[in-house]
Amino acid sequence: LGLAKGKIQMKIAIASDLHLEFGDLDIQNTDGADVLLLSGDICVAADLDMRDRRQTEMGFARWRSEMFHGFFERCATNFPHVIYVMGNHEYYHSDFATALGDMRRKLAHLPNLYILEREIKVIDDVTFIGGTLWTDMNNQDDLTMYHMRTMMNDFRVIQHSAVPVNFRTSEGEFKTRVAKFSPEDAVTEHVKMKEYIQVVTDMLGKNPNRYVVVGHHSPSRRSTHAMYANDTIMNGGYSSDLDEFIENRPQIKLWTHGHTHHEFDYVIGETRVVCNPRGYIGHEPQADKWKLKTVEI
C-alpha cells in the first residue's frame, strides 16, 4: 500500500452512520484533511427542508431540518471537499425514485459538497467513486430476500414510485398504488453499482489516478462483528462478498462503508477497507465516544 513515485499524499477523513436524527455533531478538521467522506446514514432526507424554508414555523420538524443544514454547512466550511453517499436511512419515509434528487436540491447551496450515486468526483489525482451499493442478498438467495422483506425497515418505509402495483379492491375495482422498495430492488441497485465500479476502474484504470470507493453497505463479510458471525441470512442485508472483485482491482486504494455500527479497518489485496460509524448517540455506548478517523493514501 505504499505511495507510488511522484504521488502526493492525500488526507481523507472518514465518517458514517452519524444518525443526526438522534443528536447533533460538530466535526472539526483537526487533522487537516483534504476530503471528508460521509458514507451514508447521516440523516433522514425527508426531514431536511429547502434552505429558503428554514426560517419559518420553527416547530420540532423545522428544528431538526435546521440542525441537519447546520451540520452540512459546518462540514463544507471545515473541509475543502465533502463527498457524501446516501445510506438506506436517508431514504426512509421518502420515495426511492426522487429522494436523491430532492437531497441534491436541498444542499445545492454548498458547492464543495458532492452527493454521488454511481458517479465519480476527481480531486487532484484521486478518483472517488460513490454510491450506496446495497447488497446482493446472499447472491440473490430466495430465503434471504424473504426474511429481509419481513424483517428490515428498508422494505417497509421506503416507497418506490417508479414501480407501480396494480391491485383489485374487495369491491372488484382495479386500482394502482406505489410499490415499496424491495429486496429485488436492492439487488438491482447493487448490480448497477458493482458494474459502474467495474467500468470506471477497468476502462479508466490505465490512467495514473488512484481510486477510492465511497459506499454505505459493506463490500466484504469481514465487516461482520463476531457476535453476528452465524447470522448468515441477516448478514445478507448488510454485506456482500466482493473480496475477489476488490483483489482484482489493486488501483482501488481505499474503500469506505457504513451500515454496520461497528468499526472496521483491514486490507483486501491492495485496498484498505474502513468503516468508522458513530451509531445511535444515547443508545449505543460507542456513539458517545466516537471520533473522526483520518487516513492517508
Regions found by a protein language model. Name each.
Residues 2-84, 91-98:
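N-terminal active-site segment of His-dependent metallophosphoesterases
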Residues 14-16, 36-41, 83-88, 114-118, ...:
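Active-site neighborhood of phospho(di)ester-bond hydrolases with catalytic His/Asp-centered motifs
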